[in-house]
Amino acid sequence: MEKDLKFTTSHEWVRDNGDGTVTVGISDHAQGLLGDVVFVDLPEVDDEVTTGEGFSLVESVKAASDIYSPVTGVIVEINEELEDSPELVNEEPYESGWIARIKLSDSSELESLIPSDTYLESLDEE
């Protein structure tokens, strides 16, 4: 796992793209709990999202799980590959399984996210 990723307590990950946008997906831990992903309800480009509010839905053979926005901003890109290949969320959660790119309203929000090493330690305690 990349050291530059940050996480939320609800198991979303965030990659700072360095241009005022972030890429968002769900963690390897989350996809493992869900099991085989069969559908991803993607947000729309230009949708406004707010920290902590649901903006996507991932359905698996076991359950449907809301995906919560880790930051406030505007959706600038969605991963359209997931429409035909939702299994990418399972196979490559940190690479081709990303869900959306968000233009940040306030980059300081990134400071409140959980660093990757702290996130991994919290999983070991579960």
Swiss-Prot record:
Keywords: Lipoyl. The modification N6-lipoyllysine is found at residue 62. Residues 21-103 form the Lipoyl-binding domain. It comes from the Bacteria. The keyword Translocase does not apply. HAMAP family: GcvH. Belongs to the GcvH family. The glycine cleavage system catalyzes the degradation of glycine. The H protein shuttles the methylamine group of glycine from the P protein to the T protein. This is Glycine cleavage system H protein. The gene is gcvH.
